[in-house]
Each structure stands twice: as C-alpha cells, then as structure tokens.
Amino acid sequence: MAATFFGEVVKAPCRAGTEDEEEEEEEEGRRETPEDREVRQQLARKREVRLLRRQTKTSLEVSLLEKYPCSKFIIAIGNNAVAFLSSFVMNSGVWEEVGCAKLWNEWCRTADTTHLSSTEAFCGFYHLKSNPSVFLCQCSCYVAEDQQYQWLEKVFGSCPRKNMQITILTCRHVTDYKTLESTGSLPSPFLKALKTQNFKDPACCPLLEQPNIVHDLPAAVLSYCQVWKIPAILYLCYTDVMKLDLITVEAFKPILSTRSLKGLVKNISQSTEILKKLMTTNEIQSNIYT
C-alpha cells in the first residue's frame, strides 16, 4: 500500500510478476533457433585450424610431431621473427616443407605458402633435410584465442614427446613492457627471455621480469610446454617498430650463439646481406607509388 497524498491510500504495483515475465522473455531471446544453430556451426567449421600436407594439400590424420620425430623445434611468430629465420637459418641449409596450417579469423586468412608476397599471412612447417628431426615453423598469421588450442593439438598432439627442445621467437611493442623507467629511455629494440621449468640451458639475454606477461600464441605454446614438462624458451623482442624492420630483425642475432640455433647458421655476414635484400624487396612492394 502507498499514499499519494494525505488521507488517500492506493495499491502499489507488484514487480514480482513483471520480473518473471522479463526473465521468460530473456530466456526466449536466448533460446537457439535451428537457423541460429546452423549459423554457429558454419562459423565453427570456418574457424577450424587445419594442418595440410605439402604435396597433396590433404589434412594430416595425426598431429605433425606425432607423424615426424622431433628433437629441436624453432617457432617464429610475427613478421620480424619470420624474416630473421628466413635470412639466417633457412638460407643456411636445405629445408623441406612438411605441412602448412590453414585458418581463418577476423584478423587474417592464411595463404598458400607457395608464391607468397611479403604481406600475405601464412603458417608453414619445415624440417632440415640433413637432420629431419630439426623442425622450424614460420607463422606470420594471427591465431585467435579460440584457435590456439586447436593449433597446439594439430602441431604437438594430445600427448607430446618430452625429449625435444622448443625455441619461440616473437615481438611486442615496447609500450607493453612494464618498468619503473620511462619506455622512451629504453634502448629499443631489446631482448628478454622466458623459459619453462625444464629448460636448463642459459638464455642469451636477461629474463623477463614480473609483472610483465606474454600474450597470444607464444604464451599458449610456452604454457603448453610448461604443463607437459617440455624444455622451452621464449625470446621476446621489444621494439618500437612492429612492421618489418631491419634493426628489429637484427636484434634477434644473439640467439644465434645459443645451443638451439648453433650449427644451423653457416655464414652470418652472407645471411645479413640476404636480410638486407629481403628488406629492400619488402619496401618496393609496400610502396604504392612504384
């Protein structure tokens, strides 16, 4: 009961029934129709990560590292890390492509790894012909959060071997680096490392300090290795230039002295020249006036 003015008594409306009706309407709105279900399933199929054979372009029945024995796996994620491996590692030996990942999301659509331009997104897997247990992944595409577990299962499998060593290379913008100093005073680019508990080799640079964190696919791979007790190290290059950049690529050079990459690079000066040619080609392709 409620009073509107002195002496008058009226009934106040009860909200109990109204709230029940609102909840029923919300439930009806949330109830999935057959059309909604079909759209959701189509989108889920479209977002599936597929690992294809190089020759036949058919899907692998088992994960990549279940099919091929692996002792060393180097993963480059992002354009600058990919350019580093292309110039310094892949040009120092004969590498054979064993597969490629096909995926689609809001940020990228992977292209075939043959006849690529420098702007196309791709994710290719290779092994060294002279030592097929040495694997390399070049991933220039964005793997969305809901696709990362799929990617890990397609590459490592549900019960991975522990007798291999993983090295991950990637970049982040220097503004993501948390420090008491001003980021403007930091000597960008610079390397930091983060490793799993089972990785016993020394890192070639300082370890990443708390409260800094890693993101996206590099974080997913490192977490996966930590859970499965696989020795793994992530080398993270903080830079103020996220596009393909010569100085940023060369910031990875200290990694060449590590056990992971030692012996894979034959001629550093020749590889540097190859890198410069790659950068020149990229600048020409990026110039809309040429």
Curated annotation (Swiss-Prot):
Region (Disordered) residue spans: 1-39
Record PTM Phosphoserine, positions in chain: S182
Annotated compartments: Cytoplasm; Endoplasmic reticulum
Residue numbers of N6-acetyllysine PTMs: K266
Main subcellular localisation: cytoplasm
Posttranslational modification: Degraded by the proteasome upon completion of 20S proteasome maturation.
Keyword Hydrolase: no
Record field: compositional bias (Basic and acidic residues): 28-39
N-acetylalanine PTM positions: A2
The protein's assembly and partners: Forms a heterodimer with PSMG2. The PSMG1-PSMG2 heterodimer interacts directly with the PSMA5 and PSMA7 proteasome alpha subunits.
Protein name: Proteasome assembly chaperone 1
Lineage: Eukaryota, Metazoa, Chordata, Craniata, Vertebrata
